Regions:
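Short alpha-helical segments that sit at the start of domains
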Residues: 1-83
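Residue-level marker of regulatory loop/turn positions in helix-turn-helix DNA-binding domains and
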Residues: 14, 18, 100, 104, ...
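Short, solvent-exposed secondary-structure capping/transition elements
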Residues: 61, 120, 156-157
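Intrinsically disordered, low-complexity acidic Ser/Thr-rich regulatory segments
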Residues: 77-106
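Short amphipathic alpha-helical interaction segments
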Residues: 99-125
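Residue-level detector of family-conserved "landmark" positions at structurally sensitive sites
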Residues: 125-126, 165
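Accessory beta->alpha helical hairpin/"wing" motif in late/C-terminal subdomains of nucleic-acid enzymes
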Residues: 126-140, 144-152
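Amphipathic alpha-helical dimerization/coiled-coil segments
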Residues: 146-168
C-alpha cells in the first residue's frame, strides 16, 4: 500500500517569519524593503505590523511574477526579462488584498507580548498620541519599543519560534 505524500501539519510558508522580521526591523536593517529605523528610538507595534504586511505582500507578488515570467519565457523559448517581472509584480500587488498575507493585528500584538515577556523588547519611553485618542482621549498612546541586549543575543531558532523559547 502506497502512502500519499503530503506536507506536515501546521505552519505557513513565509519569506521571513514574524519574529525574524521584528528583530531585523528593530535592529534597523530594513528587511523586505521596509524603512530603516534608528534602533535606539525603536518603533510602535502598528508601524512594525504595517511594514511586515507590506513586505510580505511585495515579496509574494515578486515571487508570483517571477514564476509567471519563467513560464512565459519557457513557452516562448526566450530569455527571462526583468522588466516584465517588475510590471507583473506591480499588477499582482495592486490586486492583492491587504488581509491576504500574514497575521491579523491582534495576533501580532499577542506575538509581541510573548517577545516582551521573554525580555527581548522593551518600551523606550517615547510615546506619541494615537489616532484613536482623537475620538477617545483616554485611549492608549503609541508606545515605541526597541530590542534589549537579550533580544540581540537570542539565537535565530529562538526568534523563529518565540513561543517555544517562552513555554518550552
Amino acid at each position: 500500500m502506497a502512502e500519499t505524500l503530503r506536507p506536515s501539519r501546521g505552519g505557513f510558508l513565509r519569506v521571513i517569519g514574524c519574529g525574524e522580521f521584528v528583530r531585523e526591523f528593530l535592529l534597523g536593517h530594513g528587511p523586505l524593503g521596509s524603512p530603516v529605523i534608528d534602533p535606539e528610538v525603536g518603533a510602535p507595534p502598528s508601524d512594525i505590523f504595517f511594514c511586515y504586511k507590506r513586505g510580505l505582500m511585495r515579496a509574494t507578488a515578486l515571487d508570483q511574477a517571477t514564476r509567471v515570467e519563467e513560464k512565459r519565457a519557457w513557452r516562448g523559448k526566450r530569455s527571462i526579462e526583468p522588466e516584465n517581472i517588475e510590471k507583473l509584480a506591480q499588477q499582482i500587488l495592486s490586486r492583492m488584498a491587504y488581509k491576504s498575507r500574514g497575521c491579523r493585528f491582534h495576533s501580532f500584538i499577542v506575538y509581541l507580548s510573548t517577545i516582551r515577556r521573554l525580555g527581548w523588547i522593551q518600551p523606550t519611553g517615547h510615546e506619541e498620541p494615537s489616532a484613536f485618542q482623537d475620538h477617545y482621549p483616554p485611549g492608549p498612546p503609541r508606545r515605541y519599543f526597541r530590542l534589549t541586549k537579550a533580544g540581540r543575543e537570542a539565537s535565530d531558532s529562538a526568534w523563529r519560534n518565540p513561543h517555544r523559547a517562552c513555554y518550552g
